[in-house]
């Protein structure tokens, strides 16, 4: 059946059931496919509702940690180390040797995680306000960070000799956090972007034409540390970009199934997207394109995951699928991912964005130059996101040994101090009728890190609600000790109730306030109770 006509007109439940039965035993999954209310089609997935725990949580920490953190040279090391002339290639040759002799598999071998204390880290994250932890399961490098059944190049067999994902899951849940995984090894990103460079060679220099180690086979490992392991299972069979990859797609699906079945994640995050393109000649019916590699791959994963999650939680759906580049026709089927970007308006459905205080993989240069993003950026970022019905997943990148550096510890401590005072206005809240007021509300299409360009002041206000209580965050401290909230003017349409009490969270004394025709005027103490964003609790009469 034509996908366009299906999406436009829908199908009867009988037809859907027949199609679900036909695909239910798809070659992509092994064993019994969980039955449930969700069928592997976008139309069926429209009945999804985001669970309340995710809407309440607001903030999570992302353990974006893999062998690529070992060189401490930032993100995409597993690709750029094979690109002659790149900064990471030059570092690699100087530090480890030429990639024909010392390749990415050898970087994986160096990952020991010898100073990793997951329980201590999770306690730090929880103190900083995290309600969930997301572990990187597989990056574009094609290395699995768990005891993978379908990839021998994994963290139990190579490197740390530990189940990284499983350990994070156990420790997070023991500390009362929800747990999720992020999966980046999709066909589009891994097969097309990361693996093909491993089969190339230098174009100039003394080793020009000598193939990189991506061309090695199991027979080349005799007498070496990786003897008996086939490097082509890590690097893929030699191929060029845009080469069909049915075997890799099959393995991708089995690995996703494995991580779902093994750890029952509360969040399933993909560093990829599901995008529609409207090329039907103007009729408005979508021609489905799924970036994960083949059409209809994403809905098969989602139906499997949602139904499995319902079984795990005794009939309740507690799972969240997080995808980027999602266009409007399927917004309600999942949780939209805005990676490093902000929504510029209040969103009807819950959403999430990811941000990082440094590079996605650890960078020694950023630490040594004290160049991390500061709490002065990330705290207003969190408040802005929550006011628009979103969540923030924040990465604090770990070095390969697993111990955060001193600047990261200082960041977490400052965030924890702020959360101790202000989390009441964040956790468990819902958006108000409007998300905010002030000059920064007019900024459109902003990238998260660009917030540092804007100097927030006390006229930049963000709102959240919890029950009858309204919270108003001022993103700056007033020089004249007065905050004016125009949206709460006595004549404003948004808040018609009488105000009984106004409190400044963390303040040692009560604040004075008056509600006037031009706004709610609050006189604040000389010294702020915290830094970066200041929360007023407004209770109705």
Give the ranges of each region predicted by the language model.
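Mature catalytic domains of secreted/periplasmic carbohydrate-active enzymes
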Residues: 23-541
């Amino acid at each position: 059946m034509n996908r366009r006509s299906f999406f436009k007109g829908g199908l009867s439940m009988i037809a859907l059931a027949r199609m679900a039965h036909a695909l239910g035993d798809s070659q992509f999954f092994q064993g019994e496919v969980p039955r449930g209310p969700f069928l592997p089609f976008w139309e069926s997935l429209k009945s999804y509702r985001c669970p309340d725990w995710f809407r309440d949580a607001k903030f999570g920490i992302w353990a974006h940690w893999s062998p690529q953190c070992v060189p401490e040279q930032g993100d995409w090391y597993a690709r750029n180390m094979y690109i002659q002339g790149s900064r990471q290639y030059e570092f690699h040759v100087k530090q480890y040797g030429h990639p024909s002799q010392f390749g990415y598999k050898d970087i994986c071998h160096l990952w020991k995680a010898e100073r990793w204390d997951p329980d201590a880290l999770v306690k730090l994250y929880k103190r900083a306000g995290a309600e969930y932890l997301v572990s990187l399961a597989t990056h574009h490098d094609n290395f699995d960070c768990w005891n993978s059944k379908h990839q021998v190049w994994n963290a139990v067999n190579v490197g740390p000799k530990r189940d990284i994902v499983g350990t994070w899951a156990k420790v997070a849940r023991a500390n009362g956090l929800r747990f999720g995984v992020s999966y980046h090894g999709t066909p589009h990103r891994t097969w097309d972007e990361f693996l093909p460079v491993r089969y190339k060679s230098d174009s100039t220099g003394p080793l020009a034409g000598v193939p990189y180690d991506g061309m090695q086979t199991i027979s080349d490992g005799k007498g070496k540390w990786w003897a008996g392991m086939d490097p082509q299972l890590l690097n893929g069979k030699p191929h060029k970009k845009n080469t069909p990859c049915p075997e890799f797609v099959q393995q991708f699906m089995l690995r996703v199934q494995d991580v779902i079945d093994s750890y029952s994640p509360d969040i399933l995050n993909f560093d990829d997207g599901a995008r529609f393109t409207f090329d039907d000649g103007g009729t408005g019916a979508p021609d489905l394109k799924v970036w994960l590699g083949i059409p209809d791959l994403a809905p098969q994963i989602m139906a499997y995951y949602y139904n499995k999650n319902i079984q795990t939680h005794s009939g309740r759906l507690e799972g969240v699928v997080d995808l980027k580049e999602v266009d409007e026709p399927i917004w309600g089927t999942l949780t939209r991912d805005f990676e490093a970007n902000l929504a510029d308006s209040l969103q009807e459905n819950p959403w999430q964005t990811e941000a990082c205080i440094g590079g996605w993989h650890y960078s020694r240069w950023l630490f040594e130059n004290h160049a991390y993003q500061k709490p002065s950026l990330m705290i207003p970022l969190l408040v802005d996101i929550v006011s628009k019905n979103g969540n923030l997943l924040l990465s604090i990148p770990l070095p390969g040994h697993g111990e955060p550096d001193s600047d990261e510890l200082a960041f977490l401590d400052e965030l924890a101090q702020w959360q101790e005072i202000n989390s009441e206005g964040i956790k468990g809240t819902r958006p108000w009728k409007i998300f905010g007021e002030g000059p920064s509300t007019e900024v459109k299409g902003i990238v998260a890190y660009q917030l540092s360009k804007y100097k927030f002041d006390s006229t930049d206000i963000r709102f959240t609600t919890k029950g009858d209580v309204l919270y108003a965050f001022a993103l700056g401290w007033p020089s004249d000790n007065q905050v004016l909230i125009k949206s709460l003017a006595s004549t404003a349409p948004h808040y018609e109730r009488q105000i009984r009490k106004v409190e400044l969270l963390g303040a040692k004394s009560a604040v004075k306030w008056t509600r006037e025709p031009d706004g709610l005027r609050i006189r604040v103490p000389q010294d702020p109770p915290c830094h970066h964003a200041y929360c007023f609790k407004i209770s109705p009469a």
